[in-house]
């Protein structure tokens, strides 16, 4: 069979793809032929990196299928590229698939690949699976490094498994590995995600920030050459909340990692008093807030419905000749909608106008999130939701099904004629999205 497959080429190869590939059953041979990602190992490596960069992680298995059909023999390096792609896309089953394929070909996973697998477990909030990966490392005599322990600690922290987190800390101590800022960030995350949350959680968070000061200079997670090659920041590898901002040097001071995680946690807890205490600690350290810290402090005030202080922070930042960031506008808009008060919705409306005047535009994810929240307004004129819809429509941006559904239902709850142009457009968009995603009932 293998000989037969390899002997088929040219026009007939697209037919083989149609018969063999996992995802091509509904495609024509011509369409399938166009999906031939590459022809040799070097081109396939480029294709994998390109798919990952485009965040089309769901295509990685297709690329691999195509590679096998071309008879291209995978190497350890390209398997690493595949696993990094699944890590960035949080596709745990695909990550394990590539690991098993490696083993089947006699390629032994190394410590870096195991670190990527553990990180993927963390992204999928599966600490127990991360422990299984770590146990597999020990069975195969793969020596863990500092990154392994920090990946493992943060993977367990995301799912709030305090017992496992402290067991890892003990293992680190026994191995002579010091706790760095990412470890303390993980400890804060673990306590935040533990259910039920203790009453003194805010105090505990402040204690961890204080404790971290004596250890922040210890480097237990030196970046590997492989991390650099794949452009993986430590924040991304360890699933730190600032991962999406780690490459924005004017947005983020990377030496404030523990403060970033602490401010984010206190914002989740809506603890204004503890947030202000943490801000004083930061000032006593002789450091200033970066943009990420400002976002979390704003979020804490706004979600506590202290709109006055939240708005003041925003205005002070904008008048201080600092570089404006889109996230400042969207954080204020989202937070001001908390409780759907008249004052808050007016702030959200005014901020949307300012944002548009400053030529900041909503992207699909942010716009959908804001529309979803704005659509929850039960009273009032629905002005903010309508504005967000119009701003996205003006740039031909289609919101997610969840956002459109919420907006559609909100419009239907109001006394709007069935032939209203807005309602008709939203209804048509809603039905088209449901049809595309297979949730619209078949009317046969």
Curated annotation (Swiss-Prot):
One of the record's GO molecular function terms: mRNA binding
Pfam family, any one: PPR_2
InterPro entries assigned to the protein according to its UniProt record, in alphabetical order: Pentatricopeptide_rpt, TPR-like_helical_dom_sf
Keyword terms, alphabetized: Mitochondrion, Repeat, Transit peptide
Presequence boundaries: 1-25
First-listed, main subcellular location of the protein, grouped into a coarse class: mitochondrion
PPR repeats by residue range: 40-74, 75-109, 110-144, 145-179, 255-289, 290-325
Recorded GO CC terms: mitochondrion
Subcellular location: Mitochondrion
Similarity annotation: Belongs to the PPR family. P subfamily.
Protein name: Pentatricopeptide repeat-containing protein At4g35850, mitochondrial
